[in-house]
Amino acid sequence: MTHLELVPVPPVAQLAGVSQHYGKTVALNNITLDIPARCMVGLIGPDGVGKSSLLSLISGARVIEQGNVMVLGGDMRDPKHRRDVCPRIAWMPQGLGKNLYHTLSVYENVDFFARLFGHDKAEREVRINELLTSTGLAPFRDRPAGKLSGGMKQKLGLCCALIHDPELLILDEPTTGVDPLSRSQFWDLIDSIRQRQSNMSVLVATAYMEEAERFDWLVAMNAGEVLATGSAEELRQQTQSATLEEAFINLLPQAQRQAHQAVVIPPYQPENAEIAIEARDLTMRFGSFVAVDHVNFRIPRGEIFGFLGSNGCGKSTTMKMLTGLLPASEGEAWLFGQPVDPKDIDTRRRVGYMSQAFSLYNELTVRQNLELHARLFHIPEAEIPARVAEMSERFKLNDVEDILPESLPLGIRQRLSLAVAVIHRPEMLILDEPTSGVDPVARDMFWQLMVDLSRQDKVTIFISTHFMNEAERCDRISLMHAGKVLASGTPQELVEKRGAASLEEAFIAYLQEAAGQSNEAEAPPVVHDTTHAPRQGFSLRRLFSYSRREALELRRDPVRSTLALMGTVILMLIMGYGISMDVENLRFAVLDRDQTVSSQAWTLNLSGSRYFIEQPPLTSYDELDRRMRAGDITVAIEIPPNFGRDIARGTPVELGVWIDGAMPSRAETVKGYVQAMHQSWLQDVASRQSTPASQSGLMNIETRYRYNPDVKSLPAIVPAVIPLLLMMIPSMLSALSVVREKELGSIINLYVTPTTRSEFLLGKQLPYIALGMLNFFLLCGLSVFVFGVPHKGSFLTLTLAALLYIIIATGMGLLISTFMKSQIAAIFGTAIITLIPATQFSGMIDPVASLEGPGRWIGEVYPTSHFLTIARGTFSKALDLTDLWQLFIPLLIAIPLVMGLSILLLKKQEG
């Protein structure tokens, strides 16, 4: 890298007394630092030392807890300054593609960011074409970002960051997990851009010490504090160290580095050792994707064999196939001469496996973790205490035996995970990137433990890594890329074979050969006028940019869009037919102890009703009890002796009626039906026995039902289900759209771009309003053509009300999303908050006027109550806007209230 001469200009960022906490964890501890401008500044240190927290404060993505942060001449606590400098800062967060949208193409991702920064169509085309050409992504402009390699995602993220020509470029571990070739190309591209845009300041966090050698100025960090600053050469001179990693170790506090010892690796002596692991044409496919492509290797007992490659190249997949955790699609693998068989427990007991995530039980202490794994591997109970004590002593865990793993530093958790993996004394140890993110002292201690296991205990160690200095410690390594093994041998053999100066250069040469590339650097993008236009307060371009992006993602996610439509249809069918107040086809049986014409006439009168179905008669109380228990009948009727005679004499008669009371409301309805049928039969008998003169009365009253003459449930329930589903489904979808961004990390684009909270929420809301209206038309079609419930009133009135109601529903989803951080929580939270008021307090079953207390108040203010009345009014009563206009007023009031509250509660910075 060309080290640019430092020009005496004001610092690009100044921090004074900055502290940051996450719960009880101290991320930054009273940091005071001036970061020079117009140079490449690197923050170095392992994971968890505060690098990302520091960068997020400088970028404005995180709220400042304590202290002052000045960036580009202004205070980052000041919202106005943050808004003003936002177009001058670019932020590329940690994690490959974290700020990208994986269903969008390469072009669409860059275009989205260009729209956010206010570029018009012509300018966007020019800038995007230049960036894609300069980074070599032009041939892949139509490929979805999710299908790019790690290096290509890295370049795409850089394109998105550079689309607005920033003055400050912030890169948070941009090359972690990327292959050496992509890493080298990335930094060459950054160098070229800086040469053309001399006023650009670049701030980088990295865990690679070799990478940090290239930077102009370094900030060494540990435990949230700054250890030292200066160039790499200055840090080496200050600590009298040969390498930057050695300098970093010497800068650590005495208590932390006192246990450090240089790793000593005795030469490996094969001595005709047996083969511990052998793979022949091992292949793994996931659909059409080939994760591992015909891999071959042989590893003798006691060897440290390294798998070197970038994230996603197939290392972890290969290891899982070797341990039997994943069945191979093709090829064969052997452990100690036996074919790999997931069911062969004896062979698997000879293997220890340590995953990237360490696989510890956080609710158990260190000692309990060791004891549990000892029992899982069937170590005799009497031997467990001694074995646990041995592991604690060997891996230096005695002082933390009663502490939970999540409370331990990363390096100690790493040693505990290794102790757990070897507690059953395996003959082979498979380690999947065990040192990722660990500080150099802990990494060297871990390596010394591995070397002792290999050389003293003759344990075969198969380790994957993407650190070059670790690969050089292995007896042999295999260079892997895109599922294929490029070369195998000792590190020295691979370097000599390529005539390279280092293992990294050799790996790059192998990668170039595999890809058919040359060493020609990519052309840097043309630098445009970096004068940033004044930022607009509210931009429809940014709003519609989010709407367009959300619509594209929704269209390309068939599961989400299909469930949104088909889920509504299915729920409508289930609820329309499933929710019914109708009590019909009641099976009854009669215990007739009279057996006269009158008793038979009474029975025929009951069976002639559409509400009752007669079953074979009863003969005894025992049969009555048995058939009612079995659910064969719902109603049992006993007609007493002399029933007909008493009727003829006008003597009062009594019938015995047994009703299944498992459902009280249904039983009450059945009781009313039987009483009504009995009274009707008595009146009919009396009318036949009376004279014509006596039959005439002063008046004759008949009851008629308007709007629903047959008192059927469908005409009442179906129009009520429409508001219920239009509240639940659109609100869930809109809530998930925001929470999904929080989970994936792309919410960072809201924090660090000029987008306002209102632009973000309104932009995301529009596609779901359109989808909600489509759902509305589907539900109306089902109501009319499937359920046979005609719509008699003004459909325009119902459509207008539905539009307002869906705006409220999606707004409620956005409001709920401001409190939720996971999609599962968003689904449950939205379901509870929308379904309970809609079903219990909005008049779906019981009228709002019949409610009391808080339930009545909820029913009066909840939007579903008003839209449900409009839906029933237009469906059943043929009403229009002139009849229903007053019900629109609460809906119109609710929209600004819900949306205003959502915008107010949405955070523009991470808390």
Curated annotation (Swiss-Prot):
The keyword Transmembrane helix applies. Keywords: ATP-binding, Cell inner membrane, Cell membrane, Hydrolase, Membrane, Nucleotide-binding, Repeat, Transmembrane, Transmembrane helix. The chain crosses the membrane at residues 563-583, 716-736, 769-789, 796-816, 824-844, 886-906. InterPro entries: AAA+_ATPase (IPR003593), ABC2_perm_RbbA (IPR047651), ABC2_TM (IPR013525), ABC2_TM_bact-type (IPR047817), ABC_transporter-like_ATP-bd (IPR003439), ABC_transporter-like_CS (IPR017871), P-loop_NTPase (IPR027417). One of its GO terms (molecular function) is ATP binding. PROSITE patterns: ABC_TM2, ABC_TRANSPORTER_1, ABC_TRANSPORTER_2. Residues 13-248, 277-507 form the ABC transporter domain. Disruption phenotype: Deletion mutant is slightly elongated at both 15 and 32 degrees Celsius and displays a significant loss of translation fidelity. ATP 1 binds at G45, P46, D47, G48, V49, G50, K51, S52. This is Ribosome-associated ATPase. The gene is rbbA.
